Amino acid sequence: MNAPVKPSNLIKGATGDWEMVIGLEVHAQVTSNAKLFSGASTAFGGEPNSHVSLVDAAMPGMLPVINEECVRQAVRTGLGLNAQINLRSVFDRKNYFYPDLPQGYQISQYKSPIVGEGEIVVDLADGASIAVGIERLHLEQDAGKSLHDQHADMSAIDLNRSGVALMEIVSKPDLRSSEQAKAYVTKLRTILRYLGTCDGDMEKGSLRADVNVSVRRPGAALGTRCEIKNVNSIRFIGQAIEHEARRQIGILEDGGSIDQETRLFDPDKGETRAMRSKEEAHDYRYFPDPDLLPLEFSQGFVEALKADLPELPDQKKTRFIGDFGLTPYDAAVLVGEHESANFYEAVLAGLANGRRDGKLAANWVINELFGRLNKESRGIAASPVSASQLAAIVDLIGEETISGKIAKDLFEIVWTEGGDPRTLVEARGMKQVTDMGAIEKAVDDIVAANPDKAAQVRAKPQMIGWFVGQVMKASGGKANPQAVNDLLKTKLGL
């Protein structure tokens, strides 16, 4: 039975509503110093053909030897995706011709992948979450790269990437909108980065996606899908899906039919174009690679890797909510990038009372620090304010040495000039005024100077904020806001 379709996920066509059905095949480059079947370097950015072994170049007589680290990374990824780990898997030859595939086949896994079914939970922008099924994860070789801009009348081949280990992570067709697809890839990339199994750098090609899109009437049978190859940014994934769905709907509403085909996305034009008819599995003539024995390992091997897994985003989010009272939204923002979560934890480690001030620290990390970093297009690694400096600012607020307003001024000074926050507060006279006599005098002066406003506040107590603001202004932001508020209530008889 089909689940009801959310109205927000429907596309309005000329003849009625349509639903997208989306599945993704994400190719993640394994973090490893050597390639899947050779000892050649995987370093990015080398001179063309400078990281190529005889195995990678498919020289006669060269035999592949499995890199155990790549196997470990694939198993760790499978565990991070809550997936079934298969203790026996088989490498197959996927036969096709392409100039940057020197063997004439790709070593992949077909019927017996290293990782089976799993699931990840994806948080959406509207606060809802969806479970996306993982169909499988298998190991395979990457191909080389064709370069078409080196010569006017010929193409060049760079085999540096040839033989680099890829994990192909295949989702089930559980996604129903471009926003869901983008959120899924974002969450998957975050998990991979936490695990350290792929750096997720889409600009360098470390993570790229084949996007399968079909459309149907709500509740109808699945339509014919088209595959959009090698989409290399999350923004482009969303654009490619939107265009492809509209293209298919236009054809169907004009009485046509969808051809199952492979397409390419042109980011400059924001459209997809036909590349070739979509191959079926039998077109590749898969058969087990005779040069490689089946890959077998014990449950103990899996358990040892499982015991060594880091805390993953969902676990960290739950801990942040439970230990520090963060909202689910704030916790999700902090764990969304590994570096962000690490920075927040470093701030917590520097606090005098992390459990008490964890929520305050989160507010400062998200609103002040991230806000400023985004404004200046900086990554967290380039932050002028360190975790220890931000922790000191939060401590000064928590112990009521400075007010929130003064804290923002202090943050600006540390951002632009650097320095120890406590030393700066002392040197620049930024301490909060806690002398009740001085605060009371300021309150009396403001109330006496504004009798009409005082009468209005007595009639409408919620207007007391105006008086609080005036007293804070008169004190240069140094008065204790709570003390000001309490004194005003007493003086005004509220």
UniProtKB/Swiss-Prot annotation:
Reaction(s) catalysed (UniProt annotation): L-glutamyl-tRNA(Gln) + L-glutamine + ATP + H2O = L-glutaminyl-tRNA(Gln) + L-glutamate + ADP + phosphate + H(+); L-aspartyl-tRNA(Asn) + L-glutamine + ATP + H2O = L-asparaginyl-tRNA(Asn) + L-glutamate + ADP + phosphate + 2 H(+)
GO molecular function, one term: glutaminyl-tRNA synthase (glutamine-hydrolyzing) activity
Native organism: Nitrobacter hamburgensis (strain DSM 10229 / NCIMB 13809 / X14)
Membrane-spanning intervals of the chain: none
Similarity field: Belongs to the GatB/GatE family. GatB subfamily.
Alphabetized UniProt keyword annotations: ATP-binding, Ligase, Nucleotide-binding, Protein biosynthesis
Subunit structure: Heterotrimer of A, B and C subunits.
Enzyme class: ligase
InterPro entries, per database record: Asn/Gln-tRNA_amidoTrfase_suB/E, Asn/Gln-tRNA_Trfase_suB/E_cat, Asn/Gln_amidotransferase, Asn/Gln_tRNA_amidoTrase-B-like, GatB, GatB_C_1, GatB_Yqey_C_2, Gln-tRNA_amidoTrfase_suB_CS
UniProt-listed Enzyme Commission number(s): 6.3.5.-
Protein name: Aspartyl/glutamyl-tRNA(Asn/Gln) amidotransferase subunit B
